[in-house]
Amino acid sequence: PMNERLKRWPHLPLIEGNEIINPQVSAKDQELLTKQYTQRAVSFIERNRKKPFFVYRPHSMVHVPLFVSDDFKGKSGAGLFGDVMMEVDWSAGEIMRVLRKHNLHKNTLFVFTSDNGPWLNYGDHAGSAAPLREGKGTMFDGGCREPMLAWWPGTIPANSICREPAMTIDLLPTIAHLTKAKLPEHTIDGQNVW
């Protein structure tokens, strides 16, 4: 039975660049991923704070299977999913903290978003799209309509809400516009929404 499982779901390595740094990520390793991702992002910002930089920090959490570090286990009062959300929130806060520490926050666009709604086949421990209908894998609003937070003190007014529709594919042309970077020559589907 274990060999059949491995054929369908082989062990997942941890890769940095093109190098496998951990060939078989254990459950304990996954408990530490959010902290490790955060530490690496903070370290990158520290090292590159004197020049323009781009950090893309996608978390593997809150995708199932869910794992959380000991510092956040049982802390949210909302079960494992809540604990994982609390740790991801902490991670975003750490990145914002280092931006403030080096006075980079007024010259940095910080974006926090999701790629899809909750996995409904995992029950209530995978989140909720309420009040929207359905979740991941559907074309209903609960599956494809996601929140996005953008933080840029001095440029984006605090507590402002944009109700214009946009998609994550719009991030590349928008960021390129803001940074005066050249877009690829081939056609892309996104649009500058600034």
Where are these regions (language model features)?
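Short, solvent-exposed loop/turn and secondary-structure capping segments
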Residues: 1, 25, 65-72, 121-128, ...
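Acidic, His- and aromatic-enriched active-site or binding-groove loops in soluble protein domains
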Residues: 1, 85-88, 130-136
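Short, solvent-exposed turn/loop segments enriched in Gly/Ser/Thr/Pro and often Arg
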Residues: 55-65, 112-120, 189-191
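A long, amphipathic alpha-helix that forms part
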Residues: 32, 36-45, 69-108, 125
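Solvent-exposed loop/turn segments at secondary-structure junctions
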Residues: 20, 29, 60-64, 90, ...
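Formylglycine-dependent
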Residues: 1-53, 59-68
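Substrate-binding rim/cap in mid-to-C-terminal beta-strand-loop elements of soluble/periplasmic
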Residues: 12-22, 93-102, 121-122, 128-187, ...
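Loop/turn elements at helix/coil->beta-strand transitions in domains of secreted/extracellular proteins
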Residues: 49-55, 104-110, 145-146
